[in-house]
Amino acid sequence: MKFLFDLFPIILFFATYKIYGIYSATAVAIVATFAQIGWVWLRHRKVDNMLWVSLAIIIVFGGATLILQDETFIKWKPTVLYWLFAVILFLAHSFFGKNLIRAMMKDQIKLPEPVWVRLNISWSVFFGAMGALNLYVAYNYSTDTWVNFKLFGFMGLMFVFIILQALLLGKYMEKNDNQKI
């Protein structure tokens, strides 16, 4: 359910684009992200930092799209977000000795340290590649294709990447008496 909730602004962006176009879809994405944060705040009295970052990026790039009536800015939004994720993962590990992937997942799975390092690097590279792929699609295909790719392509790639990660990690996961594998 959380997965669908996380996709809420993207799904509304997609649906609005199909009916009303890129500028209406951009406005809806901004409002939907505000609504998403409001809902999280009302339910948990705490909002994840990544949601705030996503809101800031959609306000800046979506706002520029609406004010300047130039869809280029909204097309850059996923790239900026993905590259930001990639850089944060890389810098946190390289300069601060923090493995953010381990910090997020350590309660779910137990892995040897070298595997956590590889996992962190693979996610950083994946996000970097996703950002580059977004720009490729944005600049080489129609806006219709980009919007479709933004929802279905990125979701599909993310799904495949997660499945591949799970398959690769399966051999390293430590069994625990309470955990069924």
UniProtKB/Swiss-Prot annotation:
It is a multi-pass membrane protein. GO terms for cellular component: plasma membrane. Its main location: membrane. Pfam families: IspA. Coiled coil: none annotated. Keywords: Cell inner membrane, Cell membrane, Membrane, Transmembrane, Transmembrane helix. InterPro entries: YciB. It comes from the Bacteria. The chain crosses the membrane at residues 24-44, 49-69, 81-101, 119-139, 149-169. It is found in: Cell inner membrane. Signal peptide: none annotated. NCBIfam families: ispZ, PRK00259.1-3. Belongs to the YciB family. Plays a role in cell envelope biogenesis, maintenance of cell envelope integrity and membrane homeostasis. This is Inner membrane-spanning protein YciB. It comes from Nitrosomonas eutropha (strain DSM 101675 / C91 / Nm57). The lineage of its organism: Bacteria, Pseudomonadati, Pseudomonadota, Betaproteobacteria, Nitrosomonadales.
